[in-house]
Amino acid sequence: TRYCSSVNKQGELSSWTDKVRVVPRTQRLIPPKIDEDVVAVIYDALLNNRKFLGSYLKRGMRVSKEYPVSPLGLVFRDGVTYLVATLREYPDVRQMALHRFRNAERLDEGIKSPKGFKLDHYINEGEFDYPEGDFINLEFKARNFVIQALRETPLSHNQGIRPFEEGWVIVSCRIKETQQLRWWLLGF
């Protein structure tokens, strides 16, 4: 939305940022503070396909470590901004919370992107749902009031809903086993 405002300051899009919001479905948490200077370096590196040297504090650690980082994309989830990236020369893709970067310095070296990497594919494969296993056959009993929500926004393309007892239905589908699925099921 910032892009739309800057491109069209006087036109129809100038008030776009005042009219669009993303609201989390979960309990709202206060977003973590992110160092503006660090973010500026990371965004610049991402836009220009350049590496940066990042000092990153992993969760549960007391001391940060420095890594050459190849930024591949940004994902915004529940008030937290994640950098999707590779570290050093390794091809494995990582998720790094921006607020955990303590320092960032631009490097004059192009990024190392895994062959065929696409951010949408990475997300659609469930990497942000914290995979725990393979696909499972899920079947659960739910009250009728859940039916409309699951018809409008199904769990998977092969989801089925069939009547059960008075006021209940059986929902079935084949879906990847993830922590996110467990959290969702526990929400009922």
How would you name each of these model-derived features?
Residues 75, 79-81, 88-90, 107-111, ...:
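Short, charged/polar surface micro-motifs in flexible loops or helix N-caps
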Residues 1-57:
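Bulky hydrophobic/aromatic content
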Residues 120-188:
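Polybasic (Lys/Arg-rich)
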Residues 40-87, 94:
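Loop-centered beta-sheet repeat module
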Residues 89-122:
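Flexible linker/loop signature enriched in Pro/Ser/Thr and Pro/Gly
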Residues 79-80, 99, 109, 166-169:
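Beta-strand-connecting loop/turn residues
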Residues 66-68, 93-98, 139, 170-172:
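Well-ordered beta-strand positions in beta-sheet-rich domains
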